[in-house]
Regions:
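Active-site cavity-forming subdomains of large catalytic enzyme subunits
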Residues: 3, 84-303, 326-333, 379, ...
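Short, Gly/Pro- and small/polar-rich lid/capping loops
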Residues: 415-417, 564-613, 718-727
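Core structural elements
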Residues: 59-76, 170, 314-322, 334-356
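Internal maturation/activation junctions in enzymes
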Residues: 216-218, 309-332, 336, 340, ...
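Acidic/polar, glycine-rich intrinsically disordered N-terminal extensions of enzymes
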Residues: 1-83, 229-233, 539, 543, ...
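Conserved phosphate/anionic-ligand binding catalytic regions in large, soluble enzymes, centered on
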Residues: 75-83, 87, 95-119, 167-169, ...
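Terminal amphipathic helices with adjacent charged low-complexity linkers/tails
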Residues: 197, 256-263, 267-272, 341, ...
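Catalytic alpha/beta core of large soluble enzyme barrels
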Residues: 270-272, 317-322, 404-405, 417-424, ...
Length: 757
């Protein structure tokens, strides 16, 4: 009997989390082996490790507690990897040497796969004097371009895809350039960007007051605060960036306000961190804790089980601090000094649906607040008991801690316990993006987001090269089907497309009240929302206590979300209508950089005395590696003319960008009337098919397409089923139109790809 609620869950486990040897030999035979591996590794610091291993295994079993993907993939593997998802890097000095020292640290961190966040407000503005060199400063945006190039280079070397967050204060003299930087579609593609909005700035926006842009006490320019706010809003309305972070609120509510100042976040925004701070993340799966789902007057979330699970999860995550490696020693020291963790939730929308409550309603906000308050109380209680057993975090100061942040709203029983025993972890709660692990857990709703699609189809590549369609159903919807058969879904089953923006904000605000760190959430707004109404969303987020706001409005720039009727392709994949004999260009060809990286493959065709040497060079576009050109060389002059023609044609197709995987399919479909050959135990029908196989292997190796089981980049006409949902943009990993903005990250519901990792 499988533990997986859906085939996609098992495939994601196999692809991302299952332990395998370097040669591909499977070491985790079952998902139980994966759970046991994690439990054993995280129980090692305990005096009674065997007993705690069993408790940790019980928490992991059936996907009740979901550690972040880094922990699932890396714990107990003996590999030199970090178990932390992301980092905020050190403060950037305003000097050339200091700036490039920070670039080196960023490269070393990203090389190990960690996403990074930086505040670029510390770099002097463009045009400022540079003493001693008789020159003007180039400004922080120019150095962000260097960081962006570094990220592309790290990815082109085969490392995990990069994610970076850049922040800038709302009073920095270069803030106007920062706001509009991503209106250039080719610039800063590897960055998420957010403006640090201070409380005085927000008050000046309300009163239409003036606003000074300053650096080191010097006023460079004065603008109207409302005009600057409108520029931020217009850029976000049109390009989905920059986001807005209410930085004074973050610092005022920080448990560690007495010993640190925060000016940056991790790439997805749920962890505001000090210099060298690190994200340690895990999620309670609320959907697994609902008893008597869909039974009127009986369905409820078992809060006693929740308390026990939270206590175990806190202990597990605390042990990760000691078990993990870190890219930099400064990161290890920061983690050890404060031992902050980010315990959150996933499956909230599913749990609400299972107890009969409509996501976004006042009742949903009330329940969300209640459940997260319960989690916070259980987490702080567990951490206090851990402190009594193992010691408080080194920078703990009882009076200062109890007067700060989350402690101001905590009940007296917990406060007294902390004063008596101390507390092991400085901060404990955070709502992180959970797109991939939520699919791993059976496609539960992600984080505190609404259900995005009740059901959809994806295409899966089979061993014989054919593709099958597979329905992927939301966890709660599938449970409804299992219990109620064909009965229609009740009205309280809503999705992200049917919710008003104020419903999203209401839920985020309800959650933020009980979360000591921050929340990664996307507020989906309709394409036709007016600019004034759009601005109101951000002001509502500020007024209701949110620590930040991220929206997604589909449009021609960000990627439209299109309705698809039965049997009809999305408009953007239909053939163009050609009037008369006009030539229609699919896309402008990409310019060739001066130098490209690639691979050369040797193919020995049995019917030829001489081998073919196939060179495929790649280019990085929008943070994604893709084939750009092909060359074929051989001593066999019989092949010369057609190989030149073939490679010129294939290269011309590649340079147009987009989905070029059809080249593989067309080549592999060619049969030679003289017969094919057996190569590596497989029949290949022609030398052209062999070339197609090489190109396919290369595309898989660079991550342009997926291998067997996870779907080739293919026919985009995947239909959304049941609730007439709408497909999203094309996924850069699997090519299916199931890429959506969820929790501040572009996440694919077909293969689990997430920009945030």
């Amino acid at each position: 009997m499988t533990r997986f609620a859906a085939p996609i869950a098992e495939q994601i486990w196999d692809m991302k989390y299952r332990l395998k040897a370097g040669d591909g030999t499977v070491l985790d035979t079952t998902v139980e082996d994966t759970w046991r591996r994690i439990a054993r590794a995280l129980a090692e610091p305990e005096a009674d490790s065997a007993a705690w291993e069993d408790k940790f295994y019980s928490a992991l079993e059936d996907f009740k507690f979901l550690p972040a993907g880094r922990i699932v993939a890396g714990a107990g593997t003996k590999r030199s990897v970090t178990l932390f998802n992301c980092f905020v890097m050190g403060t950037i000095p305003d000097s050339m040497g200091g700036i490039f020292d920070m670039l080196k640290e960023a490269a070393l961190t990203m090389q190990q796969g960690g996403g990074i966040g930086y505040d670029f407000s510390t770099i002097r503005p463009k045009g400022a004097d540079v003493k001693g060199v008789a020159a003007d400063a180039s400004g922080p945006l120019s150095f962000m371009d260097v960081w962006d190039a570094m990220c592309r280079t790290i990815m082109s070397a085969g490392s995990r895809r990069g994610a970076m967050m850049a922040t800038m204060r709302c009073d920095h003299p270069d803030i106007e350039d920062f706001i509009t930087a991503k209106s250039d579609p080719a610039r800063l593609r590897n960055f998420n960007m957010s403006v640090l909005a201070t409380d005085p700035f927000m008050e000046a926006v309300k009163t239409d007051g003036s606003w000074d842009l300053v650096f080191n006490g010097t006023v460079f320019k004065t603008v109207q605060a409302r005009d600057l706010w409108n520029r931020i809003m217009r850029a976000t309305y049109d390009y989905a960036e920059p986001g807005v972070i209410f930085i004074d609120r973050i610092n005022a509510m920080n448990n560690l306000a007495y010993c640190e100042t925060i000016s940056a976040t991790n790439p997805c925004g749920e962890q505001p961190l000090p210099p060298y701070g690190a994200c340690l993340l895990g999620s309670i799966n609320l959907a697994r804790l609902v008893w008597y789902p869909f039974e009127e007057d009986k369905a409820h979330l078992c809060e006693n089980s929740l308390d026990d699970l939270v206590a175990t999860a806190v202990r597990m995550m605390d042990n990760v601090v000691d078990a993990s490696r870190f890219p930099l020693e400064a990161q290890a020291q920061e983690a050890a000094a404060k031992r902050r963790i980010g315990l959150g939730v996933t499956g909230l929308a599913d749990a609400l649906a299972m107890v009969g409550v409509r996501y976004g309603s006042e009742e949903a906000a009330r329940l969300t607040s209640r459940w997260l308050e319960r989690i916070a109380r259980a987490a702080y209680t567990a951490s206090a008991h851990l402190a009594g057993e193992k010691g408080a975090f080194p920078l703990f100061d009882a009076d200062a801690f109890l007067a700060s942040g989350a402690m101001q709203s905590m009940d007296d029983e917990v406060r007294d316990l902390i004063r008596e025993k101390g507390i092991r972890n400085a901060l404990l709660t955070s709502i992180a993006p959970t797109g991939t692990i939520s699919l791993f857990a059976g496609n539960v709703s992600s984080g505190i987001e609404p259900i995005f699609a009740h059901a959809y189809t994806r295409k899966v590549l089979q061993k014989d090269g054919s593709r099958t369609e597979e329905e992927v159903v939301d966890y709660a919807v599938q449970m409804w089907r299992d219990l109620k058969g064909d009965a229609p879904l009740p009205d309280h089953f809503v999705n992200a497309q049917t919710l008003a923006p104020e419903d999203h904000v209401r839920m985020q605000a309800a959650a933020q009240e009980r979360v000591d760190s921050s929340i990664s959430k996307t507020i989906n707004v309709p394409e036709d929302i007016s600019f004034e109404a759009f601005k109101d969303v951000y002001m509502q987020a500020y007024e209701t206590g949110c620590k930040g706001c991220t929206t997604y409005r589909p449009n021609a720039v960000t990627g439209s979300v299109l309705s698809v009727s039965e049997g009809e392709a999305p408009d953007h994949v239909k053939g163009a209508e050609v009037a008369g004999g006009d030539v229609v260009y699919i896309a402008e060809p990409l310019d060739r950089p001066a130098a490209l990286e690639g691979q050369t493959y040797k193919v020995k065709w049995p019917m030829s005395e001489h081998a073919l040497y196939i060179t495929i060079n790649d280019v990085i576009i929008a943070g994604r590696r893709q084939p750009f050109e092909v060359f074929i060389n051989s001593k066999n002059m019989e092949h010369f003319a057609w190989t030149v023609a073939l490679t010129r044609m294939i290269s011309a197709v590649f340079r147009r960008g987009g989905d070029v995987s059809f080249v593989v399919e067309e080549l592999k479909a060619v049969f030679d009337p003289r017969g094919g050959a057996w190569m590596s135990g497989k029949y290949v029908p022609s030398i052209l098919a062999a070339i197609g196989g090489v190109i396919e292997r290369h595309m898989i190796a660079i991550g342009f397409i997926e291998g067997e089981g996870m779907g080739l980049k293919t026919d985009p006409q995947a239909q959304v089923v049941n609730m007439n949902e709408t497909p999203g943009a094309a996924c850069p990993n699997c090519g299916q139109f199931t890429l959506h903005m969820i929790e501040g990250c572009m996440t694919c519901s077909s293969c689990g790809y997430s920009k945030c990792g």
